[in-house]
Amino acid sequence: MDKKLERILPLVQKPARYTGGEYGEIQKDKSEVDLRMALCFPDTYEIGMSNTGMRILYQVLNDLPGVWCERVFAPWFDMDRQMREKGLPLYALESGDPLSEFDAIGFSLGYEMAYTTVLEMLDLAGIPLRSAERTSLTPLVFAGGSVCCNSEPMADFFDLMIIGEGESVDGEVLQLLREAKAAGWSKAEFLRRAALIGGVYVPSLYTPEYNGDGTLKAMRAAPGAPERITKRIVTDFENSCFPVDAIVPSTEIVHDRVGLELFRGCIRGCRFCQAGHIYRPVRSRSVEKCMEYGKESLAFSGYHEITLLSLSTSDYRGLNELCDGLMDYCESRGIGLSLPSLRADNFSMDIMQRVQKVRKSGLTFAPEAGTQRLRDVINKNVTEEDLLRSCAVAFQGGWNSVKLYFMLGLPTETDEDVLGIAELADRVVHCWRENSPNRSHGLRVTVSTSCFVPKPHTPFQWEPQVTREEYMRRVTLLRDNMKARAVTYNWHDADTSLTEAVLSRGDRRLGAMIENIWRQGGFLESWSEGFDLKRWERAAEEEGISFPFYANRERSLDEVLPWDHLYMGVNRRHYIHEYEQAHQGLLSPDCRAQCSGCGAAAFLKGGRCDG
């Protein structure tokens, strides 16, 4: 261990974040590898080690011949300060080597509020922030993850960005980098060739042009670069990598359990949901494969809980069979099985009673909107009757805790829709009184609301976000009408949602603002300790950026959007159709009931999703 690190660790919170050496960590002989890759997560160890994508990529990249992939996480504020004061550069956990010594540095980006943390990590490693400032071939700095579906706000900082699922592309990028090192290519030559790999976006080869009103006129590709970058996906999901021997953290993390991924994509088509669109087509694993992975992961890790992961776990075709099989294994070993947020329209009490035998937890539903009219607008395809029926069954089974998640500020929302949330919560309380066999323990209903953030690659990508003031007015209206003592109301911070809305639909001009914020000390801004709206407003004013232009402005359907050249598999015609359906209050069937012809099925052999 570095002597500077030895002196620092007693001075910071949770020093185990920074030491590595966990059970399952991959160590390699440096003399036997010719490419060193740093897999960076721009948040704390506890968040990054809970991320399923990080665990998968760590395994996939270390399985490549001649490659050693190591992990790097953002230090907390106290550690960051100590590292700067003591002159300790950012390092990888496995070897302790400085980040600047690696051939490739890849960031996993899943949230827009992590952008400034990327800059903090690069600077802490002594690496120039902007791609244009890094003239040598290595270290190659790139990114992947869900927010790369709009790459433009961070385009100036990365050499390239992965569009789609990284485990299907990263190996090709590293192989090309290996060839480039051996042949002595310039960075420009490498990037020119990398741009020809499917799913690779090289921002420096594309120049945005703007109209007089500030909207995007066109994205001009350099000669030889593709006009449109099409995402890459894992086509054989059944046999794709699942890290059964994943690292077991030596300190507590957010999701301290086995996370078993059942399928990718979603059949539902909720119009606000970015993940449900960009992860199409639906691909699932067989019950047998899930059973195999689940048991092996539990045996290796020693965890006493396993959770079933997907965008809509209750839509997994073999859920009953899988839960039965896993519980046969788990019950005798005292291992708990948990399910994430459930859909009220296919809630199964049989499943819940079985999985709660070891460890009982509360129920979580996400109606998203307070009235049926608005649920139809967003294509939620869940009725109030569905929710109350599911709650009644649960209360009859002895449950006395329910969490309900909603959004405020959805397109076409009125005060009647807002008040509908309070009325629905009251009906849940009444339902408990009518159905609970034992009311002595009382009822806890937790209602949580967040502010709707319009996202790229969704039918609502053209919609405005309500202003901060309007969001808080609706929060106050709802809070004042929550009368039942059994109901607790929580709401998400309006300032963060506004900033997220700016970044999520931003263009390349935001890069200067992001760097400005970082230079003012901004990083780890997904945490309340790190976020400061005044800092963002100050930087926006200095860089000539209008928050209302990006967050609160309605786009026309023919406007050129900053992400139009990045094809995530769903065609524009489908988004427009769903946008029009929403404004007519019309539902669209789920993918299992009827194919919408969105275009995503073309990624799979035979052109058919596993809906």
Model feature map: region roles:
Residues 8-38, 45-46, 203, 209-259, ...:
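N-terminal [4Fe-4S]-dependent radical SAM core
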Residues 77-78, 153, 207-212, 317-318, ...:
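Flexible glycine/acidic-rich beta-alpha junction loops that bind and position SAM and/or redox cofactors
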Residues 37-43, 61, 248-274, 298, ...:
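N-terminal pre-triad scaffold of radical SAM enzymes
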Residues 75-220, 459-507, 515-528:
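Glycine-rich beta-alpha loop elements in corrinoid/cobalamin-binding modules
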Residues 51, 252-288, 597-611:
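Canonical Radical SAM [4Fe-4S] cluster-binding loop centered on the CxxxCxxC motif
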Residues 66-78:
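A short beta-strand-loop structural module common to alpha/beta enzyme folds
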Residues 39-40, 113, 295-403, 408-446, ...:
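Conserved SAM/AdoMet-binding glycine-rich loop
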Residues 2-27, 31, 37-39, 484-611:
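Radical SAM enzyme core and accessory elements
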